[in-house]
């Protein structure tokens, strides 16, 4: 049986989060917990992903609008068995159905593949975990390797309480069997709910074999019911990613102070200082150095470039042998060529900057093209917006723009031109020209400053 579908339980409110956000939308590594689970289901090549939703329905659908899921509404949350009953009409008899939880984001493809492989031809397979302190969890009771029961803490004998293997709730069986067992579930218990743990008893009654696979790491199956548990998942996940990067040759100044909230592709001899955040898809070339406190989102950085402390780069690219920062901001559409220098308190947006050009201090460059070998002085502003529309500034090669210059777009400064400090440029500048628009300097001898009136 090669066909497989996944059911993700995501209808809970998450009262202990004390939040208006549905629990499964709280994030780990910058991504909603349920999105992690959906991505894992995709890795399994699931034919269908049934998402059981309830609380925060509109918000959940909005945030996951692009996901290929079958939305299954659970009006009342009456237990895990009740949630599965809502999805049962969509099950195909001859496919495996894997049940997952939207608030347990760290489950891996490899563990689930082991679980599916362990499922008997006629039977069910559970994912279990070994805990040093299993207090409060349902114990796995085995006979001859097969699971015969899950005994809750309050019902366990002293001997059963010594068992450290516990139920995670993750399981797999074929669609036909699940539909049969789900139809027989009842809510004859103190909570008046339908539980998937009762399916194990039904399977044994029917003579089906119940297999179990133990997760290698308990954190894979940990859920988050409150923000403390959410923070623990975040730290574990970040530590795991940092470990992988260190083993791949990336130098992290302090693995405990590094956050990867997306995908990082890197070359050799990359150095990352403390409190750096990586978001989206980021590519770092060989010998790249990232300073403390930087944030990189969807950025490409060329070989041997240094991003100095507290710089923010988003949807932008920087060529090789460049220097950015400290305290620089590259906004979407910034494309910097090799050997460029961008200094402190410079903001660049939707602009191309040519090879070797320097923009060193206190400058805004937006909607512009700047050639190679230019010097853009301190306090230069490309005035690109008239309150309604954006206009472009074009600067050729080897242009020198002095300090405190305003370039009022649309305007073009051609190759080799020089703009004197303090000028406001409203007309095109020809190649090789020197342009100044300063008011002539006046001198008044023997000037006396006004004195305060008594």
UniProtKB/Swiss-Prot annotation:
Binds 1 Mg(2+) ion per subunit. This is Bifunctional protein GlmU. It comes from Actinobacillus succinogenes (strain ATCC 55618 / DSM 22257 / CCUG 43843 / 130Z). Pathway: Nucleotide-sugar biosynthesis; UDP-N-acetyl-alpha-D-glucosamine biosynthesis; N-acetyl-alpha-D-glucosamine 1-phosphate from alpha-D-glucosamine 6-phosphate (route II): step 2/2; Nucleotide-sugar biosynthesis; UDP-N-acetyl-alpha-D-glucosamine biosynthesis; UDP-N-acetyl-alpha-D-glucosamine from N-acetyl-alpha-D-glucosamine 1-phosphate: step 1/1; Bacterial outer membrane biogenesis; LPS lipid A biosynthesis. HAMAP family: GlmU (MF_01631). GO terms for cellular component: cytoplasm; membrane. Residues 249-454 are annotated as: N-acetyltransferase. It is found in: Cytoplasm. It is an enzyme of class 2 (transferase). Keywords: Acyltransferase, Cell shape, Cell wall biogenesis/degradation, Cytoplasm, Magnesium, Metal-binding, Multifunctional enzyme, Nucleotidyltransferase, Peptidoglycan synthesis, Repeat, Transferase. Residues 1-227 are annotated as: Pyrophosphorylase. CDD domains: GT2_GlmU_N_bac (cd02540), LbH_GlmU_C (cd03353). Residues 228-248 are annotated as: Linker. In the N-terminal section; belongs to the N-acetylglucosamine-1-phosphate uridyltransferase family. In the C-terminal section; belongs to the transferase hexapeptide repeat family. The active site is at 361 (proton acceptor). UDP-N-acetyl-alpha-D-glucosamine binds at residues 9-12, 23, 74, 79-80, 101-103, 138, 152, 167, 225, 331, 349, 364, 375. Mg(2+) binds at residues 103, 225. Acetyl-CoA binds at residues 378, 384-385, 403, 421, 438. Its EC number is 2.7.7.23, 2.3.1.157. GO terms for molecular function: glucosamine-1-phosphate N-acetyltransferase activity; magnesium ion binding; UDP-N-acetylglucosamine diphosphorylase activity.
């Amino acid at each position: 049986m090669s066909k497989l579908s996944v059911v993700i339980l995501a209808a809970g409110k998450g009262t202990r989060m004390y939040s208006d956000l549905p629990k499964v939308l709280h994030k780990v590594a910058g991504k909603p917990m349920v999105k992690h689970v959906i991505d894992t289901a995709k890795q399994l090549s699931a034919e269908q992903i049934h998402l059981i939703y309830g609380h925060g329905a509109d918000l959940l659908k909005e945030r996951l609008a692009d996901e290929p899921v079958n939305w299954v509404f659970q009006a009342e949350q009456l237990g895990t068995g009740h949630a599965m009953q809502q999805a049962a009409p969509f099950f195909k008899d001859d496919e495996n159905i894997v049940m997952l939880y939207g608030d347990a984001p760290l489950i891996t493809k490899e563990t689930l593949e082991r679980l599916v492989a362990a499922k008997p031809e006629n039977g069910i397979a559970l994912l279990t975990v070994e805990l040093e302190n299993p207090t409060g969890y349902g114990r796995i009771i085995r006979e001859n390797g097969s699971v015969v029961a899950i005994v809750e803490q309050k019902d366990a004998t002293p001997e059963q309480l010594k068992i450290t293997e516990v139920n995670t709730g993750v399981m797999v069986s074929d669609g036909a069997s699940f539909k049969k067992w789900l139809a027989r579930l009842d809510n004859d218990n103190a909570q008046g709910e339908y539980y998937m743990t009762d399916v194990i008893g039904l399977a044994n009654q029917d003579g089906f074999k119940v297999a179990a696979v133990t997760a290698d790491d308990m954190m894979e199956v940990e859920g988050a019911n409150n923000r403390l548990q959410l923070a623990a998942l975040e730290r574990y996940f970040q530590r795991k990613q940092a470990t992988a990067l260190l083993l791949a040759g990336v130098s992290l100044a302090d693995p405990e102070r590094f956050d990867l909230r997306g995908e990082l592709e890197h070359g050799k001899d990359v150095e990352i200082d403390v409190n750096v955040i990586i978001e989206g898809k980021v590519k770092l070339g060989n010998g790249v150095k990232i300073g403390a406190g930087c944030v990189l989102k969807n950025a490409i950085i060329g070989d041997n470039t240094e991003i100095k402390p507290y710089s923010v780069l988003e949807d932008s690219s920087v060529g090789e042998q460049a220097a950015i920062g400290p305290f620089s901001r590259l906004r979407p559409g910034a494309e910097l060529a090799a050997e460029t220098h961008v200094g402190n308190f410079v903001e660049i947006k939707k602009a191309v900057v040519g090879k070797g050009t320097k923009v060193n201090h206190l400058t805004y460059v937006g909607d512009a093209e700047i050639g190679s070998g230019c010097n853009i002085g301190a306090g230069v502003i490309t005035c690109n917006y008239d309150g309604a529309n954006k206009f472009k500034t074009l600067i050729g090669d080897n242009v020198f723009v002095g300090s405190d210059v305003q370039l009022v777009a649309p305007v073009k400064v051609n190759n080799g031109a020089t703009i004197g400090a303090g000028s406001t440029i409203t007309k095109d500048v020809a190649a090789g020209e020197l342009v100044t628009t300063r008011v002539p300097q006046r001198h008044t001898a023997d000037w006396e400053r006004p004195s305060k009136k008594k």
